[in-house]
Regions:
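Extracellular/periplasmic periplasmic-binding protein-like sensory domains
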Residues: 239-316, 383-389
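N-terminal secretory signal peptides and thylakoid transit peptides that target proteins
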Residues: 1-18
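Segments of small-molecule ligand-sensing domains
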Residues: 295-312, 316-378, 385
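Extracellular/periplasmic bilobed ligand-binding domains
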Residues: 120, 181-276
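Extracytoplasmic "Venus flytrap"
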Residues: 36-55, 79-85, 108, 172-179, ...
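Beta-alpha junction/loop-to-helix N-cap segments that form part of ligand/metal-binding clefts
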Residues: 47, 51-52, 69-135, 144, ...
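An alpha-beta-alpha
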Residues: 143-204, 223
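Hydrophobic alpha-helical segments within soluble ligand-binding/sensing domains
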Residues: 88, 144-167, 179-181, 209-210, ...
């Protein structure tokens, strides 16, 4: 749905024939619908959290400019998770009970997502997780990044079509990787006639990858898949310093990481729902608005635009999808919103985007890109939309 269609649908809501477009004073006077942003605004993930905050405001400003939601303006209420599960739970409860937010978004870590869900169960509110995930399904959850099923199979299919048949994997030793990611990787590699030579499980906090890289070099795989969640920058830098020959591939890929690796990412192939290089009017408008919004900050640049993180686009997408579903349902109540989500299709920066039948995950194109020397990603292929698979 484009902005014109969204504006037209916004004419019909709780105010009947009176709308924000006709009577803007009514919208200004109406009590706002609050959106809760629960993000890491301090600590190592501050930039991710701040990007989510800015992108949430972009979505809210756009919706308010089109007349608001159900005849009421949207307003953002913000809390810092401090990257702590206990703090996230406390702040989620504050947003839900004190601020009476209609939904929660902005979380980066899976532990933050789980804490937000725990709090949301009491208040019966929607949690929108703006990150890729293992395929987590819950009646109160919408994930706006790609699930494992939407990442692994398309990337392995594309790689093995190009001749890569032997794979070594280096992954963070977390439960979702053991239960979902690596089994999906094994299945996809086997399905296409390849071999998964070994999986190297690394605990969070690992900073020296030398021994693992030496063992991989001795095995001589054609592909090395990495899912290092806590410090991919150090891993990629060491991978290049060892002059590794296998093609490096990953499901943790975006322009900001390429910049942080100071050229070491060049040539790596990644999979994501969003890259800045998507050439569409919607994406260019989004990047231009974001760049203007952060003009007074030290946000890194890539060409004419401030660097966008995929988490930010996922946050923007989640609020847009929530607002359209609530508008269609005539309510912000979670069950009504979840039911309406499955019928939605919006043009977003990533492209045309819908939601799975259960309302748990987005359905959009899976983008395969290759990091370039200028830190951009060249789009190699777009696959899908691929249906997600629930993993609990």
């Amino acid at each position: 749905m484009n902005r014109r269609d969204f504006s037209r649908s916004a004419l019909w809501g709780a105010l009947g024939v009176f709308s924000a477009a006709v009577c803007p004073n009514l919208v200004r006077a109406a009590a706002p619908i609050k959106i809760g942003l629960l993000a890491p605004l301090s600590g190592p993930l501050t930039r991710v959290g701040e990007t989510n905050r800015h992108c949430a405001m972009l979505a809210i400003e756009e919706i308010n400019a089109a007349g608001g939601l159900l005849g009421r303006p949207l307003e953002l209420a913000v809390e810092d998770t401090q990257m702590s599960t206990a703090v996230t739970l406390e702040k989620a409860r504050q947003l839900l009970m004190r601020d009476e937010v209609a939904m929660l978004t902005g979380m980066v870590l899976p532990s933050e997502r789980e804490a937000a869900l725990q709090a949301a169960k009491t208040a019966a509110r929607l949690v929108v997780y703006p990150n890729f995930d293992e395929g987590r399904c819950d009646p109160l959850l919408l994930s706006t990044g790609l699930s494992v099923a939407q990442r692994v199979e398309p990337l392995i299919t594309w790689l093995m079509r190009g001749g890569g048949k032997s794979v070594s994997a280096v992954v963070s030793d977390v439960g979702s990787n053991r239960k979902v990611l690596v089994p999906a990787l094994e299945t996809a590699v086997s399905r296409h006639g390849g071999r998964l030579l070994n999986v190297y499980w690394l605990p969070f906090g690992t900073r020296d990858y030398g021994a693992v890289l030496q063992r991989i070099a001795a095995q001589q795989p054609q592909l090395v898949w990495h899912s290092i969640g806590d410090d991919p920058v150090t891993f990629v830098k060491q991978y290049r310093s060892f002059a590794m020959r296998p093609q490096l591939v990953t499901d943790i890929a975006h322009e900001s990481l390429s910049i942080a690796t100071a050229g070491a990412s060049t040539g790596a192939i990644g999979v994501s729902s969003y890259f800045m290089s998507i050439d569409s009017a919607e994406n260019h408008r989004f990047l231009a608005r974001y760049t203007a919004r952060v003009a007074d900050t030290r946000a890194p640049r890539l060409g004419p635009y401030a660097v966008m993180l995929p988490h930010g686009e996922c946050t923007y997408a989640g609020i847009r999808l929530f607002a359209q579903a609530a508008q269609d349902a005539g309510s912000v109540e979670v069950m009504h919103v979840k039911t309406a989500l499955s019928g939605i299709s919006l043009n977003l920066p990533r492209g045309k985007t819908g939601v799975s039948r259960a309302g748990d995950h987005v359905t959009c194109m899976t983008r395969i890109g290759q990091a370039q020397a200028d830190n951009s990603f060249a789009l190699l292929d777009s696959v899908g939309p691929i249906l997600p698979t629930c993993q609990g």
